């Protein structure tokens, strides 16, 4: 009996480890595993949030992006993996005008967000989420996290860990087609 229970526990741990290894693995293929480890993309209620851009002070948020699919990237300057997402985001923004990109810098102030944007040459509209409220509302468990929203701002999929250019393109295309 003990052997069977131990074998079952080990099998469950191995399956969980395999799912975790898939999160953040970006080989350029279409997303197959959502952040939950499920094979189906996430879907849910319409996402809404807004704030002031850390660079310009202008109001930004999903309300200003009605009718357009949106990539929302959630990061922080203290996150070791977050700079890995900068180059793919720059390339994605430069090659794309049909999908909006909005950044949320979480659990730090606007000054830290501006420094990160400057250091990583990112010209993205960015909201400072100092208390982590927006990240919590979005279900963020790990940084960076990227959400792909349909044109009616439903969550089409979510990716935990740095997303490469292939992942950004394929998931954004899927979100655009879904809504």
Regions found by a protein language model. Give the residues of each.
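Short active-site neighborhood of thiol/selenol oxidoreductases, capturing the structured segment around
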Residues: 60-83, 89, 101
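N-terminal targeting signals for export/organelle localization
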Residues: 1-48, 179
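Structural microenvironment flanking redox-active thiols in thiol-disulfide oxidoreductases
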Residues: 83-120, 130-137
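A short beta-strand-turn-helix
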Residues: 41-43, 48-70
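Soluble periplasmic/extracytoplasmic beta-strand elements of cell-envelope proteins
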Residues: 73, 103-105, 147, 157-158
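Thiol/disulfide oxidoreductase modules built on the thioredoxin-like
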Residues: 115-122, 130-179
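Conserved N-terminal glycine/acidic-rich loop preference
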Residues: 65-69, 113, 122-124
């Amino acid at each position: 009996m003990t052997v069977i229970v131990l074998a079952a526990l080990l099998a469950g741990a191995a399956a969980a480890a395999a799912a975790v290894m898939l999160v953040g693995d970006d080989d350029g293929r279409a997303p197959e595993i959502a952040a939950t480890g499920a094979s189906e993309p996430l879907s849910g209620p319409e996402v809404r949030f807004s704030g002031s851009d850390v660079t310009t002070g202008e109001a930004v948020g999903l309300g200003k992006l009605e009718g357009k699919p949106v990539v929302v990237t959630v990061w922080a300057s203290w996150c070791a993996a977050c700079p890995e997402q900068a180059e793919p985001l720059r390339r994605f923004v430069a090659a794309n005008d049909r999908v909006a990109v909005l950044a949320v810098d979480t659990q730090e102030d606007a000054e830290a967000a501006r420094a990160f944007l400057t250091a990583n040459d990112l010209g993205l509209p960015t909201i400072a989420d100092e208390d982590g409220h927006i990240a919590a509302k979005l279900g963020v468990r790990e940084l960076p996290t990227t959400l792909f929203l349909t044109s009616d701002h439903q969550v089409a999929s979510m990716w935990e860990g740095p997303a490469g250019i292939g992942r950004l393109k394929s998931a954004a295309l899927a979100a655009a087609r879904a809504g």
